[in-house]
Amino acid sequence: RQGVDTTRSQLGLGIMTFIKYPDEWVKLRNDKSLASNAFDELIRERPTTTWVTREANQDFEFSGVNINKGTTLHLLVHSSSRDPIWQDSPTFDISAKRKKHFGFGGGSHHCVGHFMAKSDSVIALLALSSFMKKIQHDNEATLLPDSGNTSPITLPIKYAVNY
């Protein structure tokens, strides 16, 4: 199921994001070359992984705070990709040139399935944006309980079809 859950989850969160920013959906519909960048911007804006848990393997000090070996740390992926210190603008913009996001982790903890998730999602965004003109909520979405990973359980939408 690696890659499949991420793709399903990220597409659901992506549709929710495009509903919130309809001008960006129009931008994607009008310029398919933005699909890959749109996926990265969706991961930056609303990643499926909201935090990762790590354990300190040695004592260290970070920004004046002492962290003891064995301490459990929760690293907020969402904030790392939206912090104005690291990003020029927190605004959702699928045409923006951004620094690398951490939606798939980093270093030795980088998701091995990220190529699959990205390629599948870009293909899906291209297909969906080709035939879905206007997307809106049809009812309230329900999300997984807050657990470090998130995804719509239900996402009732309605849309105009472009044939």
Language-model segments: residues:
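Cytochrome P450
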Residues: 1-163
